[in-house]
């Protein structure tokens, strides 16, 4: 499997060549399971298209497409610079990259937003983006769970979104997980509209 080919369309939404290249670097570093597992093992929190083999990949593509479409609306997109838009789209592409941890565990890691942000920081030397851009990227990934910041034992684990960037990425992920919003995919896991 060519991991980058899986995101050919989504990478095209990112305009800045440096951010696009860094996104490719991080896609190559995603664990193989990311491309194979469902977004939800129970189906409780995600629509039908994100279940089954490749479901997490499809959920991610839906979140990126939602972000891209919203940013095309001037009433939303004009609030962000072109670089900020690219970083948020990259954040959406990577937000669930370590959903089952690394190495892979059986169930979703509640702290997967932190794991992914830390993974990016571990590979910071391989990236071309500025420190400020990487910090923004990690911040939108760390807070993508929105108000759901407590683990199954009631411990406060995650940060809630505070900035407009963090809230935007959370909103796109949230919309991509709504059961009534069904995104059509073809047999190659590409959005078909």
Regions found by a protein language model. Name each.
Residues 1-104:
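Acidic/His-rich, divalent-metal-binding segments that scaffold phosphate/diphosphate chemistry
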Residues 56, 109, 161:
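Aromatic-acidic/polar surface patches that form glycan- and anion
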Residues 59, 95, 112-113, 144-145:
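Histidine-centered active-site/metal-ligand motif
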Residues 63-67, 109-126:
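An active-site-proximal "capping" alpha-helix that borders the catalytic cofactor pocket
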Residues 67, 71-74, 101, 120, ...:
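Short, well-ordered alpha-helical segments in soluble proteins
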Residues 79, 88, 128-191:
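Histidine/acidic-rich helix-loop-helix segments that form or flank divalent-metal centers
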Residues 103-107, 156:
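Short, low-complexity, polybasic intrinsically disordered segments
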């Amino acid at each position: 499997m060519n991991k980058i080919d899986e995101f050919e369309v989504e990478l095209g939404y990112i305009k800045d060549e440096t951010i696009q290249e860094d996104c490719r670097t991080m896609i190559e570093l995603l664990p193989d399971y990311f491309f194979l597992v469902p977004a939800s093992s129970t189906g409780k929190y995600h629509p039908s298209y994100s279940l089954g083999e490749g479901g997490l990949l499809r959920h991610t593509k839906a979140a990126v497409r939602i972000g891209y479409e919203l940013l095309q609306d001037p009433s939303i997109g004009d609030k962000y610079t072109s670089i900020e838009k690219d970083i948020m789209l990259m954040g959406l592409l990577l937000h669930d990259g370590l959903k089952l941890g690394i190495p892979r565990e059986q169930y979703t890691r509640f702290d997967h937003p932190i794991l992914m942000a830390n993974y990016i920081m571990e590979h910071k030397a391989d990236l071309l983006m500025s420190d400020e851009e990487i910090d923004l990227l990690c911040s939108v990934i760390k807070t993508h769970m929105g108000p759901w910041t407590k683990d199954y034992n009631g411990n406060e684990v995650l940060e809630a979104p505070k900035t407009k960037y963090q809230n935007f990425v959370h909103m796109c992920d949230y919309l991509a997980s709504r059961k009534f919003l069904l995104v059509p995919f073809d047999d190659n896991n590409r959005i078909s509209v």
